[in-house]
Structure formats: structure tokens, C-alpha cells
Amino acid sequence: MPLSLPVISTEVRQALDAGRPVVALESTIITHGLPRPRNLAVARDAERQLRDAGVVPATIGVVAGTPTVGLTGEQIEELAADEAAVKISTRDLPVAVARGASGGTTVAATAFLARKAGIRVFATGGLGGVHHGAATTFDESADLVTLASTPLVLVSAGAKSILDLAATLERLETLNIPVVGYRTRRFPGFYVADSGHDLEHSVDTPQEVAALVEARDALELRSALLVANPIPPERQLDPELHRRVLAEAWEEAERQGISGHDSTPFLLDHIRRATGDRSLEVNIDVYQNNVALGASIARAMAG
């Protein structure tokens, strides 16, 4: 076992040491979020997108028990093909390390490892949050509590729309995690540009985000800054279709007695099948849109 974890690739370490822009990318989208072989193509495209923008990509995952910041192309291929790869949140990291497991890191684990490596910007698709019925089940993503103590910039299209978004926004406020809309005053709903919930703050440029980060750091606040970046309306899932399919998914989950951790993959799979894979294409568009904004923010912060 390496004496110091995570292992940071030479390319990422040199970029950080030189003050060049770096953007972290998670790997559960590779291991669990997208079907094969599309998962590998999207992972490669995201890294290429960052490089074309003059930014060093740092895809983060765990390979054979080694948390790694800046996976090689071969390591990404291995994770993309590994049907035994596990989903690794922050609490799972010591277990994965001790047992030599391989897996994709969630938003929580990726944020933790990125910050430990010194990376300041992280782009993902959608944030985890508070699940429906959490008042009795206490089912809430570790993403939220991790971001409360991890001072980086997270770019996402809001939180996944299967969640209780009103409760998620309340928890973000309670945890002192600032949320700013990017060119919007409405919280995005992942598949749709507008979840129906207002945001108090918005920014119009990457430079404004950089200024917010500078102010946060000067105040020595330890929370992440969540930049809520909506998918362009012309590329979103039709809002009425989204509403109907989501309601049907919940009804089917209740009929089959599916709840807790099993509900997320069930609901997402139902939405994908019910929309004829249209939701899959929107998912990828959301991710690419956030990667592009993450690159712009990283450049602004490095400049």
C-alpha cells in the first residue's frame, strides 16, 4: 500500500504545482451511470473536452485498492469494462483500500480526493441529495455533508430530479453550502432546466465565480461552492414528459415495494426506458455542459 494516498498522476501534480487549471471528474458515471460501451466514450470525450480548453483533466477513481487522482487511459478502460466495480463513497474508501477493490467514486468521494490533491474545481452531472420520505428513512446522500467541509467549486445541473429538491435545497442552506445559479435564478432539475425552485443568487461569468471563491477563502469558510448550471432549454427533456414519466416511475416503485438505496437505479432505469433513451442523451448533454463550464471556471481561477 502506498504510504501516501491518494496517488496523484505526474501530469496532474505538475499542473497543480505550476498553477495551471485542473478539473476533477468523477468515475461513477463510468462504472454505474452509463451503459457500456457508451460509458467509455463519454469518459474519453470529457477528458478531450478539457484538454481542448487548455485544462488538465483529473478523472478520479479507485483501482485495485489505490485511490487515484488522474487515471490513465488504460485505467479508465479497465473501470469502464469492470462489471465487478463497486460504487465508492467517502465512507467506503478505507474498505476499498484495505481490500484492494476497484470502483467508481461518487461525488462525495471524488470531492474529498480532489480537495486532498489540491484540485479546486470539480464538474459532475447531478448532485445527490435528500430522498423522498427522508423524514422517516433518513435517506440522504453523503454528497451534502461532504461538500459542507470540502472547499472546492462543484459544477452540476442541480440535483437529480428523482430527489426531494425542496428538502435538498433546505439541507444545502443548513449546511452553509452556497448555491449560485449560472445565468439563472432557478434551481435546475438535471433533466430539465427549471425545477420550479428559486435561487437567491446567480452569476453570469466564470470570473464572478472566481471572485466568490476568493471571498470564501478569505473568510476561511470550509464549504464547497455549488454552481447550478442548467442544461440549455432546447436540449432538455420535455418538461411535461419528464413530469409524467417521473410520476409513473414512483408509482411503479411503490407497487413493487422498492425503496431506499434500490430506488435510485430503479427510477433512473424506468425513466430511461420510458423515454426511449432520450433521457440518456440528455444525461450526457448535461455532463458535457457542466464539464465545459468547469473548464471556464478553472481557467478564470488560475488566471
UniProtKB/Swiss-Prot annotation:
One of its GO terms (cellular component) is cytoplasm. One of its GO terms (biological process) is nucleobase catabolic process. It is an enzyme of class 4 (lyase). Binds 1 Mn(2+) ion per subunit. Its EC number is 4.2.1.70. It catalyses: D-ribose 5-phosphate + uracil = psi-UMP + H2O. One of its GO terms (molecular function) is hydrolase activity, acting on glycosyl bonds. Keywords: Glycosidase, Hydrolase, Lyase, Manganese, Metal-binding. It holds the Pfam family Indigoidine_A. The active site is at E26 (proton donor), K160 (nucleophile). Substrate binds at K87, V107, S141, A142, D143. Signal peptide: none annotated. Mn(2+) binds at D139. Homotrimer. Belongs to the pseudouridine-5'-phosphate glycosidase family. This is Pseudouridine-5'-phosphate glycosidase. The gene is psuG.
